[in-house]
């Protein structure tokens, strides 16, 4: 049974050079607030496996793309699953945590997602487009993303990358959840400055869209971000379901929503650590 103040190992790469944002500021703020309720230590993702046995739970936050330390992450994941270590988010997520296969699965299942294939013979299944997006299955932060012609997309589509039509969207919007509870939404009104986010008030239809993916993923405890784009016909299409270490852009929300998010995270984390519903 965890102590009255559970021990949390908080995993973050404070020096990760994110474009247009400072991951470290967000984690400095979050850890300062979590310390009000938990005994907390912070470590680099490369050190997590060696340290985690001394803690009641591991919280993975802004740890950077796992491509930069894939062998280390795979070892951490294997050891945590074998030992039954409580990892927040749980390592059973079906979104980005497991790679980009879910984009293919959701496309095949008819979900409202940017259509995605990985084989040249499946390109005819995509809407006709003048340009196509090619990206790696384990990509993050646009690492390895290319915009190419149809011929180049066909050459690249060998099963190791994903191919999507280039969507001329109006804007991108993100929905942030703790467990299955919606917290806030942000959008990038200027497509040429996609890192500059502003508060967004979602409609009931917007929230219904986002909740479809939260329900599909069945992550009972944790933080998820549903990234979408507003297509030319006005509909929303899923771009990414981030369930490993979603950046939260807490600096873009007001104090009231920031405090509400922290409170929701504390409640979720305590329930997760104690094993309560």
Model-found features: residue ranges?
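A short beta-strand motif that forms the metal-chelation/ATP-contact edge
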Residues: 55-60, 135, 175-177, 184, ...
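Short amphipathic alpha-helix with an adjacent loop that forms part of the alpha/beta core around
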Residues: 47-54, 123-127, 152-154
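C-terminal active-site "lid" helix and adjoining low-complexity regulatory extension at the edge
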Residues: 230-277
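Phosphate-binding site of ATP-dependent enzymes
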Residues: 141-237
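ATP-binding N-terminal substructure of ATP-dependent carboxylate-amine bond-forming enzymes
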Residues: 1-86
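A conserved helix-loop-beta module that forms one wall/lid of the active-site cleft
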Residues: 43, 74-149
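Short, solvent-exposed loop/turn elements at beta->coil junctions and helix N-caps
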Residues: 46-48, 120-123, 137, 164-166, ...
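Flexible loop residues that form catalytic
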Residues: 13, 63, 121, 137, ...
């Amino acid at each position: 049974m965890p102590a009255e103040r559970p021990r949390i190992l908080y995993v973050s790469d404070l020096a990760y050079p994110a474009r247009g944002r400072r991951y470290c500021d967000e984690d400095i703020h979050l850890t300062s607030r979590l310390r009000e309720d938990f005994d907390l230590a912070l470590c680099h993702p490369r050190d997590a496996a060696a340290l985690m046995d001394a803690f009641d739970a591991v919280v993975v936050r802004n740890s950077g793309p796992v491509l930069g330390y894939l062998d280390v992450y795979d070892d951490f994941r294997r050891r945590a699953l074998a030992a039954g270590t409580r990892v927040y988010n749980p390592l059973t997520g079906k979104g980005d945590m497991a790679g980009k296969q879910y984009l293919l699965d959701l496309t095949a299942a008819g979900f409202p997602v940017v259509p995605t294939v990985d084989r040249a013979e499946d390109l005819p299944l995509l809407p006709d487009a003048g340009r196509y997006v090619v990206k790696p299955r384990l990509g993050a932060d646009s690492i390895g993303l290319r915009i190419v012609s149809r011929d180049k997309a066909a050459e690249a589509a060998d099963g190791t990358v994903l191919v999507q039509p280039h969507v001329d969207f109006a804007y991108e919007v993100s929905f942030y959840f703790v467990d299955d509870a919606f917290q806030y939404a942000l959008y990038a009104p200027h497509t040429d400055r996609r890192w500059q986010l502003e508060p967004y008030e979602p409609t009931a239809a917007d929230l219904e869209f986002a909740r479809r993916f939260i329900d599909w993923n069945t992550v009972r405890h944790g933080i998820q971000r549903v990234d979408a784009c507003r297509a030319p016909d006005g509909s929303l299409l899923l771009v990414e379901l981030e369930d490993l270490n979603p950046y939260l852009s807490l600096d873009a929300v007001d104090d009231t929503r920031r405090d509400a998010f922290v409170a929701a995270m504390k409640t979720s984390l305590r329930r997760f650590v104690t094993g309560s519903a």
